[in-house]
Curated annotation (Swiss-Prot):
Polar residues bias spans: 1-10
Cited function: This is one of the proteins that binds to the 5S RNA in the ribosome where it forms part of the central protuberance.
Entry's Gene Ontology cellular component terms: cytosolic large ribosomal subunit
Subunit field text: Part of the 50S ribosomal subunit; part of the 5S rRNA/L5/L18/L25 subcomplex. Contacts the 5S rRNA. Binds to the 5S rRNA independently of L5 and L18.
Pfam families (alphabetical): Ribosomal_L25p (PF01386), Ribosomal_TL5_C (PF14693)
Protein name per the record: Large ribosomal subunit protein bL25
This protein's encoding gene: rplY
Length: 228
């Protein structure tokens, strides 16, 4: 489990928050559970390194607030529209037994042992993330789809995914598709329109008499030369 150090934040104005960011820190807040919301600050450099690892918003982390560890789930990150740098972060307290909604990434493995992919098949991914409802202590890091032995024409539906007890997709009532393995697309040369074929045939008919006329002219020219 990843960890992140945080400190209690006592900012009271926008100027205080700007000064905080200028010093390389990111303001945030912890909410949820029986405790009150708490303002915090984290080091931007450390936060960005965790974000770059991927699936940051889908994994519980240990937040060491003023040296005291607590489990939280990163819920939302606000970014600067120009620099794309993080400017604020929300953390949700993890309370055992309490169910939450969370998007979990879909990961595909064993591409190299799929006969369908070896024959040029195309993996069409319909959903790269799936929203689940689950207890905070049972959040899966990812939904894994095994492509081993999968051939062209096969598909993966949510019913084929084994989830822990108490973990369910938020979409209910239908067995939605996650991905399919389709046949390779072959580009065919467009057929010549019937009108174009008819015009080509007419051009051929017109060219034939002209050729015969040229042949006749050549014969007459040769006979004249012999008389001379």
């Amino acid at each position: 489990m990843n960890s992140l150090d945080a400190n209690t934040r006592n900012t009271k104005s926008k100027g205080d928050v700007r000064s905080l960011r200028s010093a390389g820190n990111i303001p945030g807040i912890i909410y949820g559970g029986p405790d009150q919301n708490q303002k915090v600050t984290v080091l931007k450099k450390t936060l960005k390194s965790l974000i770059d690892k991927g699936s940051f918003l889908s994994n519980i982390i240990t937040l060491n607030l003023d040296g005291k560890p607590q489990n939280v789930l990163p819920r939302e990150i606000t970014y600067n529209v120009i620099s794309d740098e993080p400017t604020h972060i929300d953390f949700l307290r993890v309370v055992p037994g309490v169910k939450i909604r969370i998007e979990v990434p879909v990961v595909f493995i064993n591409h190299e042992t799929s006969p369908g992919l070896k024959r040029g098949g195309v993996l069409n991914i319909v959903r790269r993330k799936i929203e689940l409802k689950c207890p905070s202590e049972k959040i899966p890091s990812a939904i894994t789809i095994d492509l081993d032995g999968v051939d062209i024409g096969e598909s993966f539906k949510i019913s084929s995914v084994k989830l822990e007890e108490g973990v369910t997709p938020t979409i209910i009532g239908r067995d939605f598709v996650i991905a399919t393995l389709a046949a390779p697309t072959v580009m065919k040369e467009p057929e010549k329109p019937a009108e174009a074929e008819a015009e080509a045939a007419e051009d051929g008919k017109e060219a034939a008499p002209a050729a015969e006329g040229d042949k006749k002219d050549d014969g007459e020219k040769k006979a004249t030369e012999e008389k001379k």
